[in-house]
Amino acid sequence: MSKKTLYFLCTGNSCRSQMAEGWAKKYLNNNEWDVRSAGLEAHGLNPNAVKAMKEAGVDISNQTSDVIDPEILNNADLVVTLCGHAADHCPVTPPHVKREHWGFDDPAKAEGTDEEKWAFFQRVRDEIAERIQRFAETGK
């Protein structure tokens, strides 16, 4: 049986989609799912996303920041956009590709003190983890 492809998309493939990829690789059966992430642009892996995930016991430091690959997009089983910009500007997908939007705040745009910015990253990390755990348990 071939794996199903789950493709997480956001604007820059630096924070939210990277964290989602890391969590999905942790919570989903790797024999059943091929988990990928990409962005409308490739902004590079955000060091705070790596740090936040490491704090939670998930290593995403070897993941790469990539632009959307049309072949992966058009053959994915499920495409999940994680920000409104990606949802609005994501290329059209064929009818057989299921698309969902799971919106999360952008931790890279957090303002305030360093502590407040870090708390923002932690909150978004945990929200993404909860959403992916729910998907792993229910398929929804």
From Swiss-Prot:
rRNA-binding listed as a keyword: no
Keywords, comma-separated and alphabetical: Arsenical resistance, Cytoplasm, Disulfide bond, Oxidoreductase, Redox-active center
Reactions catalysed according to its record: arsenate + [thioredoxin]-dithiol + H(+) = arsenite + [thioredoxin]-disulfide + H2O
Gene3D superfamilies given in the database record: 3.40.50.2300
One annotated GO molecular function: arsenate reductase (thioredoxin) activity
Cellular-component GO terms for this entry: cytoplasm
Catalytic residues, chain numbering: C10, C83, C90
Localisation per UniProt entry: Cytoplasm
Disulfide bonds: C10-C83, C83-C90
EC number: 1.20.4.4
The keyword Oxidoreductase belongs to this UniProt entry's keyword annotation: yes
PANTHER family: ARSENATE REDUCTASE (PTHR43428:SF1)
UniProt similarity note: Belongs to the low molecular weight phosphotyrosine protein phosphatase family. Thioredoxin-coupled ArsC subfamily.
Protein name, per record: Arsenate reductase
Organism: Priestia megaterium (strain DSM 319 / IMG 1521)
Gene from which this protein is expressed: arsC
